[in-house]
C-alpha cells in the first residue's frame, strides 16, 4: 500500500488521494507509512476503474500487467507465491469508495485457492477443516459476486449439510463436510454458468477485479 504517497503528491491533497485510492486504500496506505503493521497489498485506482468502464469493460493497455507487477511485489514481501502449493499466497479483492459505505461493497476472499493449492495448504497447516472452509468461501463469494449466482443457492447447500450431519451451527461441521460443500458449490457454478470454477489463480484475480470494477 505504499502508493499513497505518490497519490497524494499527484493529486495535491489527502482528499485527492482518497478520491484516487478510495477511503479503504488510502487509509491502509496511511497506516503503512506510519509504521502500523499492515499486511502487504496494493490498490487499483478509481482512474483505472473509470478507464475500464469507459473502454467497454476492457482493461486499458498495461493496467492488468501493472496489477500483476504489484502482485509480484506482494510475493516478494511475503516470501510466498500466488498459485504455489508449497508456499501459497492468498489474496482478497475488495471494492472501495471515497466515503464509507457499510454493507454496499463487494469482497472476494481467499483468491488463489484451487484443488492443488488446497492440498498444499493442508500439508502446511495440518488443518483440512480450515482449508476447505476457506476454499468454499472463495467459491461461494466468487460465484455470487463475480458470476451472479444467487447466494441463497449456496446457503441452501450448507443448511442441507448441517441437517444431514445433525448439527445446528456451521462451526460444528467437519472437514469432510466442507470438502463436500466445496464440491457442490463448484457444481452449482457449472450449472448456472456452463463453465467450471476457474482453477487458475490469475484468472480468479482478473475476474474478481473486473467484477469489483462493475
Walk through the language-model features, giving the residues of each.
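Nucleotide/phosphate-binding sheet-loop regions of phosphoryl- and nucleotidyl-transfer enzymes
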Residues: 1-214
Amino acid at each position: 500500500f505504499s502508493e499513497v504517497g505518490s497519490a497524494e503528491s499527484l493529486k495535491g491533497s489527502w482528499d485527492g488521494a482518497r478520491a484516487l485510492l478510495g477511503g479503504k486504500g488510502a487509509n491502509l496506505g496511511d497506516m503503512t507509512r506510519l509504521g502500523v503493521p499492515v499486511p502487504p497489498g496494493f490498490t487499483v485506482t478509481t482512474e483505472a476503474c473509470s478507464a475500464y468502464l469507459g473502454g467497454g469493460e476492457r482493461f486499458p493497455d498495461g493496467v492488468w500487467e501493472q496489477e500483476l507487477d504489484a502482485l509480484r511485489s506482494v510475493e516478494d514481501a511475503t516470501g510466498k507465491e500466488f498459485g504455489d502449493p508449497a508456499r501459497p499466497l492468498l489474496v482478497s479483492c475488495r471494492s472501495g469508495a471515497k466515503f464509507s459505505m457499510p454493507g454496499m461493497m463487494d469482497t472476494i476472499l481467499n483468491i488463489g485457492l484451487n484443488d492443488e493449492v488446497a492440498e498444499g495448504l493442508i500439508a502446511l497447516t495440518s488443518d483440512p477443516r480450515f482449508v476447505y472452509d476457506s476454499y468454499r468461501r472463495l467459491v461461494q463469494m466468487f460465484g455470487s459476486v463475480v458470476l451472479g449466482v444467487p447466494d441463497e443457492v449456496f446457503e441452501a447447500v450448507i443448511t442441507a449439510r448441517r441437517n444431514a450431519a445433525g448439527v445446528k451451527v456451521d462451526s460444528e461441521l467437519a472437514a469432510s463436510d466442507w470438502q463436500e460443500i466445496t464440491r457442490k458449490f463448484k457444481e452449482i457454478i457449472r450449472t448456472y454458468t456452463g463453465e467450471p470454477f476457474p482453477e487458475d489463480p490469475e484468472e480468479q484475480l482478473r475476474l474478481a477485479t473486473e467484477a469489483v470494477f462493475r
